[in-house]
Each structure stands twice: as C-alpha cells, then as structure tokens.
C-alpha cells in the first residue's frame, strides 16, 4: 500500500492559527444549528405543547426505530433569507429507519409561522421528494401546516417546480409503488390539506387533526356562516369519504403501515 506523506507541520504557528479559526467556525455552526432546532422559539413551543402536541423532532424520534440514526437535510434552509426568522424553512426533513425500512420523513414545524410554506419550504419539500424518488424511499409526511404563506403566495406558485409539484410528485411516486403515508398532527388548511388527501394512507390524530381547504375563519368571512373546526374538517367527517386511520396518540400510531406497504 502506498503511503501518502504530509508536509504539514502540526506544531507550526500557521497550523495553530488555522486550527483555531476552523474550531471557531465549527462552534458557530453548532450554535446556529442549536438555535434552528428551537424552531419558532420558547414561547411558540410552549403554546404548541400546551395543546398536547409533540414538537416535530420529538414526533420523528417517536417514529424512528429505537437507537437508529436520522440523517437530517436542509437544516439551514431559509437562513437569513426573508428578513424574519424561518428556522429550517419551517420543516424538518431527513432519512430515518421505521420498522427496519429506510424512509424519507418530512415534518412541518407549526411553531414556525404555523407550519406555512415559504418559497424555500417548497424547495426543501421537493428536494426531499427527489431524494426519495431516486432512492425509492417510502415517504412519511407528519402534517401540521397552514398551507402556503399568504404574504408570499405569489412566490410559491410561479415556477416550474412550484407548490403544486409536491402533489404531482406524490401521485407519481405512488404510481411507482413508493409508499406515500401522511399523519395529520394538527390543523391542515388549504395547501396543507392536499398532502394527506394525495397520500396512499392517511392517519389522523384524534381530537387534534383537521383537514379543510377553507377553515372556520374563511367560511365566516366568505359566506357568513359560523362553524366549528370539528364540523368542517375533523377526522370523523373526513373518514366517511377517505381511507383514514384514527390514532389516539402519536407514539402509538401505526408504524406498521410502513412495513406493510414497503
């Protein structure tokens, strides 16, 4: 075996200076990633958990096989892009093992702008789907999203790979035999409602999950009718028309769905 010799002097002042500079950069990166993992911040997380809901990374940890790794992608997506904090573009995405099967998992972070989709959230979601398609990874969507970010809705559609391409990908991967599984974790409005609607299997968490294109506020403003979220989009109503499973609590949700379909 050929030995490659180095001429770097690890005791030189130049090496020490470079090492110190790199260590500082790595420390800065770790600090930034730790801040990103806080999502929308302590107040938003407290409000989220007070409703009996898990944070997105905790949801993923409950789903993964015990002790298995999670390869996260796009942690710094949307960092310092919009003039406001949108940590990880409001979604956590990565590859993890569920029931022994490598899966692409994407979880909306409702603590970040209600889990709404900014332009780079769309790009991140599409990138995750591309990786899944190229490697034939089952997709698990942990949905808790208000759909397209309204102040930027003009930016999430005018593109060849726009917001609607997410659902195009779901349909095509389903046709390819790549399982598309959605777990509805909260209120899924407008664009957020299409992900479970287009999935092969949808699981809805009892007393938390709702799906509607236009929720109670819009119904009230558009037609003057006041209705409850449970009436317009709660799981008992949706389940009459779609294949949905009732999940009482998320950690107990049917992980075997992945194994059955993969």
For each of these PLM feature ranges, what is it?
Residues 222-262:
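N-terminal low-complexity segments that are often proline-rich with Ser/Thr-Pro
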Residues 219:
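N-terminal cationic and glycine-rich segments that engage phosphates or anionic surfaces
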Residues 1-187, 191-194, 198-214, 228, ...:
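Terminal-region recognition feature
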């Amino acid at each position: 075996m050929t030995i490659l010799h180095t001429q770097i002097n690890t005791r030189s002042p130049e090496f020490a200076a470079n090492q110190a500079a790199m260590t500082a950069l790595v420390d800065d990166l770790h600090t930034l990633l730790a801040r990103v993992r806080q999502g929308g911040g302590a107040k938003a997380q407290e409000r989220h958990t007070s409703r009996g809901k898990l944070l997105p990374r905790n949801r993923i940890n409950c789903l993964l096989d015990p002790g298995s790794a999670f390869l996260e992608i796009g942690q710094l997506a949307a960092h310092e892009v919009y003039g406001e904090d949108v940590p990880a573009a409001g979604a956590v995405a990565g590859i993890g093992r569920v029931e022994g099967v490598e899966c692409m998992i994407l979880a909306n972070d409702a603590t970040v702008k209600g889990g709404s989709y900014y332009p780079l959230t769309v790009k991140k979601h599409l990138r995750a789907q591309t990786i899944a398609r190229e490697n034939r990874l089952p997709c698990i969507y942990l949905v808790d999203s208000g759909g397209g970010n309204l102040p930027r809705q003009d930016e999430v559609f005018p593109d060849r790979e726009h917001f609607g391409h997410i659902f195009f990908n779901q349909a095509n991967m389903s046709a390819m035999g790549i399982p598309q599984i959605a777990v509805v974790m909260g209120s899924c409005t407008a664009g957020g409602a299409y992900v479970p609607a287009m999935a092969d299997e949808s699981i809805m968490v009892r007393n938390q999950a709702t799906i509607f294109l236009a929720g109670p506020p819009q119904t009230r403003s558009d037609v003057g009718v006041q209705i409850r979220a449970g009436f317009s989009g709660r799981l008992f109503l949706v389940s009459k028309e779609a294949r949905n499973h009732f999940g009482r609590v998320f950690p107990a949700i049917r992980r075997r769905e992945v194994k059955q379909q993969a």
